[in-house]
Amino acid sequence: MAFVPPQAGYDRAITVFSPDGRLFQVNYAREAVKRGATAVGVKWKDGVVLAVEKRITSKLIEPSSYEKIFLIDDHIAAAPSGIIADARVLVDRARLEAQIYRLTYGEPVPLTVLVKKICDLKQAHTQYGGVRPFGAALLMAGVNEKPELFETDPSGAYFEWKAVAIGSGRNTAMAIFEEHYRDDIGKDDAIKLAILALAKTLEEPTAEGIEVAYITMDEKRWKKLPREELEKYLNEILQEVKEEEVEEKQEDYSELDQNY
């Protein structure tokens, strides 16, 4: 008879808690997010910016066809990490809910309402048999009365942030936000900070491998950052990073000289 680990039953069942209070399938869904492409969001007084990593695995793929920032409504967008097929289902559901709200009430859906509906769906997939948790997290951002930025977890939990990252580069990006984010940040600095945080998580950051979109309170419509502007921001950031590395090396050498 094959040896069966004690936790095997809890491991396979979606709706059964382990003795220490965990749902293993939810934890595994979170692991899918941790291995996914990095996505970041930064909020400023009058808007929000999203930036995502585009993992283009073949030179034959058309980069322009590989979208990672999805428009939900004119004023709301989402950036996923994890299993993109799962994220697509959530995005389609969010679009449907946004249309239903607009037809019912004659006005754009508040982001908080939409986030709660999506997280209700996610939570339901941790509670019933015959389904599995969504292996995707979403950054959902937009403007109504004010700019808003939310992270949705595979468990159905959600959090509002000033600046946040999901995916494999979360820890690196969050450390950069902790160091550089400030409450009075403006549009240009917010876009630059988002690109900086994302670039720091990539081995070889390029404009082709990054997608950026933003929205402002004035226009209340999402815009993708043009390729030329993205390259300009990225070149400035890479040059600043290079100069910082040179300064650090010089400091190290000066300390070395003092020791001899």
From Swiss-Prot:
Indicate where this protein is primarily found.
cytoplasm
CDD domains in the record:
proteasome_alpha_archeal
Can the keyword Cytoplasm be found in this entry's annotation?
Answer: yes
Query: Which segments of the protein form a coiled coil according to its record?
Result: none
Which Gene Ontology molecular function entries are recorded, alphabetically?
A: threonine-type endopeptidase activity
State its location(s).
Cytoplasm
**Any GO BP annotation:** proteasomal protein catabolic process
Keyword entries, A-Z: Cytoplasm, Proteasome
Family under the similarity heading: Belongs to the peptidase T1A family.
Describe the function of this protein. Component of the proteasome core, a large protease complex with broad specificity involved in protein degradation.
Any idea what this protein is called? Proteasome subunit alpha
Taxonomically, what lineage is the organism? Archaea, Methanobacteriati, Methanobacteriota, Thermococci, Thermococcales
